[in-house]
Amino acid sequence: MATFKDACYHYKRINKLNQTVLKLGVNDTWRPSPPTKYKGWCLDCCQHTDLTYCRGCTIYHVCQWCSQYGRCFLDDEPHLLRMRTFKNEVTKDNLKNLIDMYNTLFPITQKIIHRFINNTRQHKCRNECMTQWYNHLLMPITLQSLSIELDGDVYYIFGYYDSMNNINQTPFSFTNLVDIYDKLLLDDVNFVRMSFLPTSLQREYALRYFSKSRFISEQRKCVNDSHFSINVLENLYNPNFKVQITRNCSELSVDWNEACKLVKNVSAYFDILKTSHVEFYSVSTRCRIFTRCKLEMASKLIKPNYVTSNHKTLATEVRNCKWCSINNSYTVWNDFRIKKIYNNIFSFLRALVKSNVNIGHCSSQEKIYEYVENVLNVCDDKRWKTSIMEIFNCLEPVELNDVKYVLFNYEINWDVINVLIHSIGKVPQILTLENVITIIQSIVYEWFDITYMRNTPMVTFTIDKLRRLHIGLKTVDSDSGISDVE
């Protein structure tokens, strides 16, 4: 059983504040929820289990029981998950306030101990102080957290997470902030709490405390497309698709890292809860993570033989050719932007090949093919530039004054002509490696300009950012025909 979940279940009965703050979906009646997919720790109840996606950020971080309350660590309502979430620079005072909140919600005193023991001793087999009956008293106060970086902001979700060695398929990584506070001060807090426990429970408490307060922080993970809801990934190739998210909000006016102080003023806390409401947003999927996902998918379907072919049609419209016809049944081709990028890049590359190398048919086997397969994914900059350089070298360039040149005198489509004029000011007859890199980048950037594109989608924005963008009508990008250049 998850210690944090047990503590919330038992401690919520001691007063009105706890009854409100410690209410977890995992301790209530189960309701239908989206199917689970990943293994990890539920941020709401801290148990290690199968996770489903959050309705507030679409990341897999909530269990099927807790999903009924729809709580997200990015909410603006002072529920327990939000009060345990700290952002960016965490100070010693912030951690002191967190420890005070734990002591307020999960006190260990002689009175509390007697109360729990009396409630538990309903049968002779429960007379002994065994851990299975008093698991809720064995939750030490630690500065253990799960952290995640989202577009430059680092979030720390504090809690008591059991079994840290279990499989973790989420983008969150364990971080220990005890050095920011003070190990000896934290030891003192826990030794005082432990002194009230029966002797038979003190050893278990001490073991749990030291194992969760002396661990080495993990390396922070990179967020990728697989960490988001499968519903989002399945609709990425629809340019008009918008993600629907819900956020729990209230008139919370305190600084982000000071929300945990609200439990000290019960009347003020309940006044804020009276303003609680849910806000709905439709946001764009436009970001580097999802753009990379689409370009990588298209890269797997590339037919490089087209660059040596004599077909009169665009690369995506070739039919009945064993070497050049692509499989149009894949959903990635539903995105007209991917098709345009594919057609224009292959029109340009074929013009380069035909201008410089004597290859007459697409059935021939050429070394250049292995480098063409990486030409779409500009998000992997180092690998992409290496591929372009190898393609350039396969064109047998001529060196003049330490600069290599290739010819460019083959027919291209009008879209590529416009890109050439926009990127280098004319339709040239000779090109350098830098020109080739610039032109292919411009073809992709016309629709997916990753230079200024945010890394993670808008679903990971805080509520104040979402509100500002919503007022400016910027939560939805115009993807239905308007390019980044336009």
From Swiss-Prot:
UniProt keyword list: Host cytoplasm, Host cytoskeleton, Host-virus interaction, Inhibition of host innate immune response by virus, Inhibition of host IRF3 by virus, Inhibition of host IRF7 by virus, Inhibition of host NF-kappa-B by virus, Inhibition of host RLR pathway by virus, Interferon antiviral system evasion, Metal-binding, Phosphoprotein, RNA-binding, Viral immunoevasion
InterPro entries in UniProt: Rotavirus_NSP1
Span of the annotated motif pLxIS motif: 480-483
GO CC term, one of those recorded: host cytoskeleton
Gene Ontology biological-process entries: symbiont-mediated suppression of host cytoplasmic pattern recognition receptor signaling pathway via inhibition of IRF3 activity; symbiont-mediated suppression of host cytoplasmic pattern recognition receptor signaling pathway via inhibition of IRF7 activity; symbiont-mediated suppression of host NF-kappaB cascade
Segments for region (Zinc-binding domain): 42-79
Spans annotated as RNA-binding: 1-81
Subunit field text: Interacts (via C-terminus) with host IRF3; this interaction leads to IRF3 degradation. Interacts with host IRF7; this interaction leads to IRF7 degradation. Interacts with host CUL1 and CUL3. Interacts with host BTRC.
Name of this chain's protein: Non-structural protein 1
Protein's organism: Rotavirus A (isolate RVA/Human/India/116E/1986/G9P8[11]) (RV-A)
